[in-house]
Amino acid sequence: MSKVFHTQNLQFKKIEPRLPEFIWNTSPRFAKLADSKHLEFDIRSLDPGRFSFPFHFHRASEELFFILSGEATLRSPEGFQKVAQGDLIFFEEGPLGAHQLYNHSDVPCVYLDIRAMFGIDVCEYPDSGKINILPFQEVFEINSKVDYYKGEEQVASKWPQEIIRKPSESYIG
């Protein structure tokens, strides 16, 4: 079933995170209203002098911006460039798809943000050394990376002793 969203009189909700540099405005979550299974999409408005999300990339999601009005400066691995009304910007998965917008102008920059979502995504923030497990919003520092088997040394102690064989009883094949 098709869903039509009339955006002429769109009401934005202000999102005010802890750092004022990242205040932005968003439309309703159109993807939820459409019951979308693999796309997230909404319209965002970035006020003058504000940054979009911190510089980041997705490990399991592609993203697409379409600038509806205004202009901003895009930061990507290629450097900095101005984007304006009518520009379509694609961000691939991984470090080469890293991105961030800054509204350098005197008017809001309004853009459609479309993201492919196929389950869990890991969003990485190169500037601050964090990862974010999406959609759960669980944020961790990258430098806390550990060996896969860390803390598993006592695995047998979690099992009933009558089930566990002594190492000398182990099968050697």
Where is each model-derived feature located?
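A short, N-terminal "cap"/entry segment at the start of jelly-roll beta-barrel domains
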Residues: 1-38, 124-173
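Conserved short histidine dyad/triad with adjacent acidic residue
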Residues: 24-27, 42-58, 96
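Short acidic-glycine-tyrosine-enriched beta hairpin
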Residues: 77-94
